[in-house]
Amino acid sequence: MDIKKIKAVVFDCDGVLFDTAQANRMYYNTLLDHFGKPDLSDEQFRLVHMFTVKEALDYLFPEMDSMESVYAFMKDMGYHSFIQYMNAESGLNELLEDLSRCGYARCIATNRTNTMADVLKIHDMGSLFEMVVTAADVKNPKPAPDELLKIMKTLHFSPEQILFVGDSEYDQLAAMSAGTWFAAFKNPLLIADCHVASMADIGKLLELKQDV
């Protein structure tokens, strides 16, 4: 990996920018409970963590011909009350400030849809990213490369100028298809150009402190 070519750092949201395990488990368990289903198993949660909302619902409610009642309850329930249980990754704000100071574009590529704006607003991070792309902004969400390709096209970057930081197989596949560099976050099982375990590791990788 040639770090000198990197001009932008793109982050996945869940499991990278934020520890969302508690919030997402509570959200989906509330949904499942309403329809008389048991709480998520660990394997179900692992998969739902990667999925778009539509994929998650198709997976959790395979017996339903229509998801109308599920979507109606989700609309009434909302996600806003669960955002408070999302914890920003330690060192995130410092890394984002260092990236900006050193001239890097900061972006998000996430399979979240209409909840992403609220997440950033509540955590006062709306102005900290140059571009945010969700599953709702592209035809094909991750593991397809569309989110990364949209960022590259809009900001005029080539694949070798992008470092994508993700924690799931979907992130890995998206990076491979888009041709970008890939940093696996807290997941040593992924195939990646590098593995990092903290926001500080990303700063060290890009040698940000040397630019002070």
Q: Which positions does each model-derived feature cover?
A:
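Ser/Thr-centric signal marking residues that sit
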Residues: 16, 20, 110, 180
